[in-house]
């Protein structure tokens, strides 16, 4: 895939970025260079290579996936003007 001047101008317009003619011409070369590098990366054989999250092997820290109320209901509603059994009471807004 290659980028031409019209594509650069269209993307700049969609992104609402003011780009002069000189800048647009320079960006054509830069974007084509980036896309060329990405195409080179797609040629690399990565079959059998395990995905990495870091350059050093480490286990991800995980917490237990448990649903709790946080045991802080009283603290949460402490500053509310009106509550009932740890629920906020608000005025009725729909008839």
UniProtKB/Swiss-Prot annotation:
Subunit architecture: Heterotrimer of A, B and C subunits.
* Keywords of the record: ATP-binding, Ligase, Nucleotide-binding, Protein biosynthesis
Record's catalysed reaction(s): L-glutamyl-tRNA(Gln) + L-glutamine + ATP + H2O = L-glutaminyl-tRNA(Gln) + L-glutamate + ADP + phosphate + H(+); L-aspartyl-tRNA(Asn) + L-glutamine + ATP + H2O = L-asparaginyl-tRNA(Asn) + L-glutamate + ADP + phosphate + 2 H(+)
Q: What family is reported?
A: Belongs to the GatC family.
Q: What is the protein's name according to its record?
A: Aspartyl/glutamyl-tRNA(Asn/Gln) amidotransferase subunit C
The answer to whether keyword Protein biosynthesis applies is yes
Q: What does this protein do?
A: Allows the formation of correctly charged Asn-tRNA(Asn) or Gln-tRNA(Gln) through the transamidation of misacylated Asp-tRNA(Asn) or Glu-tRNA(Gln) in organisms which lack either or both of asparaginyl-tRNA or glutaminyl-tRNA synthetases. The reaction takes place in the presence of glutamine and ATP through an activated phospho-Asp-tRNA(Asn) or phospho-Glu-tRNA(Gln).
Recorded hits in SUPFAM superfamilies, A to Z, give: Glu-tRNAGln amidotransferase C subunit (SSF141000)
* Uppermost EC category: ligase
* This enzyme's EC code(s): 6.3.5.-
Cite the GO molecular-function annotations of the record. asparaginyl-tRNA synthase (glutamine-hydrolyzing) activity; ATP binding; glutaminyl-tRNA synthase (glutamine-hydrolyzing) activity
- Biological process annotations from GO: glutaminyl-tRNAGln biosynthesis via transamidation; regulation of translational fidelity; translation
């Amino acid at each position: 895939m290659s980028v031409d001047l019209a594509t650069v101008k269209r993307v700049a317009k969609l992104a609402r970025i003011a780009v002069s003619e000189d800048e647009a011409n320079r960006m054509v070369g830069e974007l084509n260079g980036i896309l060329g590098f990405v195409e080179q990366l797609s040629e690399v054989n990565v079959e059998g290579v395990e995905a990495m999250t870091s350059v050093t092997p480490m286990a991800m820290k995980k917490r237990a996936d448990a649903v709790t109320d946080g045991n802080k209901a009283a603290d949460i509603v402490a500053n509310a003007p009106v509550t009932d059994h740890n629920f906020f009471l608000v005025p009725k807004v729909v008839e």
